Design a protein with these regions (language model features):
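Flexible, compositionally biased loop and terminal segments
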Residues: 1-175
């Protein structure tokens, strides 16, 4: 199928908001976690497809700051699913030369998640075929507030602040 696609028209970066897994499962009379588990399979297929088409950057908005308002049991199950998925997929990321990055308020995640994500990011940091970015505990508001706090922390003057400088403080900047 990739033969018939004009590679000049393939974007370098694709961002996907992962939404609706729970609702999809409910419509089928299944549990929300059934939907989330199927979402993991969809992520695997999406990553494989992105690699096949030569996408350089794939960002998955996987868990927003709003998701913390869900029932604790669902959050705990999602965090366990995150840990097991990262554990299961790290070797595949390495084998396929895919780098994992994470953006968002990672310190809000359970320590077990932070540890597993850190391990995977360390093991894949030199991979160059594609960068897979997971946005976890992330929102646009969080992104802006985080950048502003870091600018203040670095004691930047009003004269120094420009669009270019501000961009350097965003977690979504290219790296």
């Amino acid at each position: 199928m990739t033969n018939s696609i004009d590679t000049k028209k393939i974007p370098k970066h694709i961002a996907i908001t992962m939404d609706g897994n729970g609702r999809w499962a409910k419509e089928k009379g299944k549990s929300r976690m059934f939907g989330h588990n199927n979402g993991v399979k969809a992520v695997r297929d999406t990553v494989e497809g992105a690699v096949e088409y030569g996408i350089q950057y794939l960002t998955l908005f996987a868990f927003s700051t709003e998701n913390w308002k869900r029932p604790k049991m669902e959050i705990d199950a999602l965090m366990s699913l995150l840990v097991s998925s990262i554990h299961d997929e790290t070797k595949t990321l390495i084998k396929n030369n895919i780098r994992l990055k994470v953006i968002g308020n990672i310190l809000q995640l359970p320590k077990k998640c932070q540890k597993k994500l850190d391990e995977c990011m360390l093991l894949t940091k030199d991979n160059t075929r594609m960068t897979l970015t997971l946005a976890l505990s992330y929102s646009g508001k969080w992104e802006l507030l985080n950048a502003i706090k870091n600018i203040i922390k670095d004691k930047r003057t009003e004269k120094e602040i420009s669009e270019e400088l501000f961009q350097q403080y965003l977690t979504t900047k290219r790296s």
